[in-house]
Amino acid sequence: MKKNILLLFLVHGANYLFPFIVLPYQTRILSIETFADVAKIQAAVMLLSLIVNYGYNLSSTRAIARAVSQAEINKIYSETLIVKLLLATICLALGCVHLMYVKEYSLIYPFIISSIYLYGSALFATWLFQGLEKMKAVVIATTIAKLTGVILTFILVKSPNDIVAALFTQNIGMFISGIISIYLVRKNKYATVICFRLKNIIVSLKEAWPFFLSLAATSVYTYFNVILLSFYAGDYVVANFNAADKLRMAAQGLLIPIGQAVFPRLSKLEGYEYSSKLKIYAIRYAIFGVCISAGLVFLGPMLTTIYLGKEYSLSGEYLQSMFLLPATISISTILSQWMLIPQGKEKILSRIYILGAIVHLLYAFPLVYYYGAWGMVISILFTEVLIVLFMLKAVK
């Protein structure tokens, strides 16, 4: 498992390190207005990608890990791949219809360009590689793709209004990852696309539904925040908040590879072996989350000033105020992915996330209306803590 954790660190290192390199270039080249528009479109694409993934990144990972034959793996792979491609097409259509409805015609073409992320997400079989514990393939695909996106950013993004180029370079990496993923699956014969039945697809959708509800609910207090903030705040505030949130997510992203590597391992264990391993992993994971939070407190303002430039001076204050999030998220991951899901309590987890999303919206709108980005920070923190409390009650 240590090897898989290391490989997942490399994957998420590529996911966060390369954009981390690009971000200061974009904040200095793009105008505040363009950077804010990029943030809004990218947030919308991330929301739609949750529909594309539809919880399969967890349900299919677990199914692959428990599969007892190659035929079963082929069946899971085929059904998941086809459904995700169909969902990507539906999301593209819905996004275009929405932009036409709100008369944001100038953003339709940039959105279509950004939708390559949706198809890349559909093709990129991370769930297959995780279930098989073959993470080397993911590292190869992600590293090549992200590096390509970085190089293209410095080549194509040249003027303050290069919104299409900025969005293309941000999203092409996922599409390339998807293509490489398909190639590696075929080359190494990890799985084969076979004929499938509509009945089986419906069953797989039902199995992934609780995971989807959980992810969709969490998106309300993650990706939707930038969109909500744009309703009440100007481009300057939106751009600064988005930049701070990207840095916070990059720091918080250090937790993801450990969480993903431990999840399939714990899913296979039962009884005393499960309990003893869980205790060891949980203590170390929580300590790591606290260390990341401490880093935001002491290094946040200094990093943003050097990294983003003087125009983004507010970002440092926003980032520092989010310091509790990494520690809280580490506890949330332990309770949800390592405890509730392996115990078969997916429905309870879904209800917790849905309740958290509903409550979040109740106070997020008025707080953002009166206090802008500070109201958003307060809303996010309160929601994450509230969800952890709900989870603690559920695992007892």
Curated annotation (Swiss-Prot):
This is Putative O-antigen transporter. The lineage of its organism: Bacteria, Pseudomonadati, Pseudomonadota, Gammaproteobacteria, Enterobacterales. May be involved in the translocation process of the nascent O-polysaccharide molecules and/or its ligation to lipid A core units. CDD domains: MATE_Wzx_like. It is found in: Cell inner membrane. Pathway: Bacterial outer membrane biogenesis; LPS O-antigen biosynthesis. InterPro entries: Poly_Biosynth_Transport, Polysacc_synth. It comes from Shigella dysenteriae. The chain crosses the membrane at residues 5-25, 32-52, 82-102, 107-127, 137-157, 163-183, 211-231, 286-306, 322-342, 348-368, 372-392. It holds the Pfam family Polysacc_synt. GO terms for biological process: O antigen biosynthetic process. Keywords: Cell inner membrane, Cell membrane, Lipopolysaccharide biosynthesis, Membrane, Transmembrane, Transmembrane helix, Transport. It comes from the Bacteria. GO terms for cellular component: plasma membrane. It is a multi-pass membrane protein. Belongs to the polysaccharide synthase family.
